[in-house]
C-alpha cells in the first residue's frame, strides 16, 4: 500500500495537574477514529509547595510518564502532534527546569497554554464530540483549575479558567482526609467564593444545556449508573453521593459502589466543586461530554472538520464505514418525517426525538454487515459498541433498542432515559411503518399515504387499488397492524376507494 493512502495519524498530549493523558487518532472517512488512549496518574499539583515550587519528586513522576508517551510519538508526523501543559505548569515557579528535560524526553516542545486558551480548546473538543442544539454551558474540573465556557455551535461566547481543582481543593479543604460536614461545607463555600466574580456574566448569557467534560464528571456518572440511576447528573443526585461519602470517616475508608480506587482520593473535592457550581449557577441537569481538551487539540489540526454538524458527520462516516445504502436510508428518513408531521408537530414531545428517529432511519440496516439473520440484534449491538460522537450513552441505548425492533423482533420499548416512554413508543411505530412502506427501495414505487392519530390510535390511509396491486405490502401492513394492536398500540389500515 502506498503511504499516501494510509489515513493520517494525530496525537494530543495534555499534561494535566492530576493526570497526564495521550490521545492518538486517525482521520478516516470524514471522521476521527480513536486509536489509543493512554493515561497515567501523576498528581503534579500535589507537588507544589506554598511558594509554587514544584518538587523534584513530582517532576520525576511527570518525566517517567513522558518517557512512556515518547515511544508512541515516534510513529506520528511532527506536524500532527500537539502537546500542552495546563494549570500546574502555568503557576510553577521552576517550570523551566521541568520543561527542559520534558522536551528532551519527548523530542517535541511543550506549549504551556493560558487558562483562556485551555477553555477555548476544551470547548472545541466538546463541540466536535457532543450533540445538542442551542447555547451550552461547559464545565471542566481539572486537578488545579476549573474551566467554564458558554458557547453555541463551534463558537465560544464566554471563557473562564478558575484556580480551583480536585487536587488543590483536596489539599486545601480535605488535608486531614476527614469526610465531615465541616470539610464539605468549607470546600463548597470556597468554590462558590471563587465562582462569584463570573456569576453575573454567565447568568446574563444563559444556556439551554449543560455538559461536564472532566474525569470528575465521568466518575460521578459511572457511580450513578453503577447504583441504578440514569446518566443525567442533578443536584439531588450529587447531594445523595455526598451523604454516601459522609458515611465514612476518612478518605482511605471510602467505598462507594461504582467509585474506582483511582478516583477515590479526589472524589470528595471534585464533588464539592460541582455541588457549588450547580447551586450557584442554578443548573438543572448535566450530561457527560464526548470530549474535551485533547479532542479539541486533535480536531484543531484537521481543517476539513472545523464546521461540520457533529451528529451528521458521525452518521455519514458510519454509513461509509459499513457500506450502507444511503439513498434507501434517506427514503426511509423522508417518509418517517412525513408521517410524524402528519400526526402533529408536538406528537414527539422532546426536541431531540425527531433527530434521534432520523439517526435510527439512517443507520437501521447496519447490522446486515454482519448477517441478515438477526439483523436487528446485530444493529443494536453495533450501535451500542461503536464510538458515535454527538450521541450520549442514553441516546445510543435508545437507538439500539429501536434498531433491535426494526424488523422481525417486536415488543414494547424497555426503560430508557433519552426521551419519554411515549415518544420512544411512537418513534418505534413510525420506524417500522416507514420501513414496510419503502421495502421496494424505490421512491417512485412507494404509495401515497396519510397517517392520522387520535389518543395514540394510528390510522394509515392508503389507496386500495395500490394495495390490491401490491399484495405483499398489504400483507405486511396487516401483520404489523395485528402486532401493534396486540400490545395495546392500536393501528388501523384504511384502504381508500
UniProtKB/Swiss-Prot annotation:
Gene Ontology biological-process entries: guanosine pentaphosphate catabolic process; guanosine tetraphosphate biosynthetic process; nucleobase-containing small molecule interconversion
Catalyzed reaction equations: guanosine 3'-diphosphate 5'-triphosphate + H2O = guanosine 3',5'-bis(diphosphate) + phosphate + H(+)
Pfam families, per the entry: Ppx-GppA (PF02541), Ppx-GppA_III (PF21447)
Keyword rRNA-binding listed: no
Record key words, sorted: Hydrolase
Protein's UniProt keywords contain Nucleotide-binding: no
Pathway(s) where this gene product acts: Purine metabolism; ppGpp biosynthesis; ppGpp from GTP: step 2/2
Recorded GO MF terms: guanosine-5'-triphosphate,3'-diphosphate diphosphatase activity
EC number: 3.6.1.40
UniProt family annotation: Belongs to the GppA/Ppx family. GppA subfamily.
PANTHER family reported for this sequence: EXOPOLYPHOSPHATASE, RETROGRADE REGULATION PROTEIN 2
Entry function: Catalyzes the conversion of pppGpp to ppGpp. Guanosine pentaphosphate (pppGpp) is a cytoplasmic signaling molecule which together with ppGpp controls the 'stringent response', an adaptive process that allows bacteria to respond to amino acid starvation, resulting in the coordinated regulation of numerous cellular activities.
Stored NCBIfam families: PRK11031.1
Name of the protein this chain belongs to: Guanosine-5'-triphosphate,3'-diphosphate pyrophosphatase
Source organism (scientific name): Aliivibrio fischeri (strain MJ11)
Gene: gppA
Amino acid at each position: 500500500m502506498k503511504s499516501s493512502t494510509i489515513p493520517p495519524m494525530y496525537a494530543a498530549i495534555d499534561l494535566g495537574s492530576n493526570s497526564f493523558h495521550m490521545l492518538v487518532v486517525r482521520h478516516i472517512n470524514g471522521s476521527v477514529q480513536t486509536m489509543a488512549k493512554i493515561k497515567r496518574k501523576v498528581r503534579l499539583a500535589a507537588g507544589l509547595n506554598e511558594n509554587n515550587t514544584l518538587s523534584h519528586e513530582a517532576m520525576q513522576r511527570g518525566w517517567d510518564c513522558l518517557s512512556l508517551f515518547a515511544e508512541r510519538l515516534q510513529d506520528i508526523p511532527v506536524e500532527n502532534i500537539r502537546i500542552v501543559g495546563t494549570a500546574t505548569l502555568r503557576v510553577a515557579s521552576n517550570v523551566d527546569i521541568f520543561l527542559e528535560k520534558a522536551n528532551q524526553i519527548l523530542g517535541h516542545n511543550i506549549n504551556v497554554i493560558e487558562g483562556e486558551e485551555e477553555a477555548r480548546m476544551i470547548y472545541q473538543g466538546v463541540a466536535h464530540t457532543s450533540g445538542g442544539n442551542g447555547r451550552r454551558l461547559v464545565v471542566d474540573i481539572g486537578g488545579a483549575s476549573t474551566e467554564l465556557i458558554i458557547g453555541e455551535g463551534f463558537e465560544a461566547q464566554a471563557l473562564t479558567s478558575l484556580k480551583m481543582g480536585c487536587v488543590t481543593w483536596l489539599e486545601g479543604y480535605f488535608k486531614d482526609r476527614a469526610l465531615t460536614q465541616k470539610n464539605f461545607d468549607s470546600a463548597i463555600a470556597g468554590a462558590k467564593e471563587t465562582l462569584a466574580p463570573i456569576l453575573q456574566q454567565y447568568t446574563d448569557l444563559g444556556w439551554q444545556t449543560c455538559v461536564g467534560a472532566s474525569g470528575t464528571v465521568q466518575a460521578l456518572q459511572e457511580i450513578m449508573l453503577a447504583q441504578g440511576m440514569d446518566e443525567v447528573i442533578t443536584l439531588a443526585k450529587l447531594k445523595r453521593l455526598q451523604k454516601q461519602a459522609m458515611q465514612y470517616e476518612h478518605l482511605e475508608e471510602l467505598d462507594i459502589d461504582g467509585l474506582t480506587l483511582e478516583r477515590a482520593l479526589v472524589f470528595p473535592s471534585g464533588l464539592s466543586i460541582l455541588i457549588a457550581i450547580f447551586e450557584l449557577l442554578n443548573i438543572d441537569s448535566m450530561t457527560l461530554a464526548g470530549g474535551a481538551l485533547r479532542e479539541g487539540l486533535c480536531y484543531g489540526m484537521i481543517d476539513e472538520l472545523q464546521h461540520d454538524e457533529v451528529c451528521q458527520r458521525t452518521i455519514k462516516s458510519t454509513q461509509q464505514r459499513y457500506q450502507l445504502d444511503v439513498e434507501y436510508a434517506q427514503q426511509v428518513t423522508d417518509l418517517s418525517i412525513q408521517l410524524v408531521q402528519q400526526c402533529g408537530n408536538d406528537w414527539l414531545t422532546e426536541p431531540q426525538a425527531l433527530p434521534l428517529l432520523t439517526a435510527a432511519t439512517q443507520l437501521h440496516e447496519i447490522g446486515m454487515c454482519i448477517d441478515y439473520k438477526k439483523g436487528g440484534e446485530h444493529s443494536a449491538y453495533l450501535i451500542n459498541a461503536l464510538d458515535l460522537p454527538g450521541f450520549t450513552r442514553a441516546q445510543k441505548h435508545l437507538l439500539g433498542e429501536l434498531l433491535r425492533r426494526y424488523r422481525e423482533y417486536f415488543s414494547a420499548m424497555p426503560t430508557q432515559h433519552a426521551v419519554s416512554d411515549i415518544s420512544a413508543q411512537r418513534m418505534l411505530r413510525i420506524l417500522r411503518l416507514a420501513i414496510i412502506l419503502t421495502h421496494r427501495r424505490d421512491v417512485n414505487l412507494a404509495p401515497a399515504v396519510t397517517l392520522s392519530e387520535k389518543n395514540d390510535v394510528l390510522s394509515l390511509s392508503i389507496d386500495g387499488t395500490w394495495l390490491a396491486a401490491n399484495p405483499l405490502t398489504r400483507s405486511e401492513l396487516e401483520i404489523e397492524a395485528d402486532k401493534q394492536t396486540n400490545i395495546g398500540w392500536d393501528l388501523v389500515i384504511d384502504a381508500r376507494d
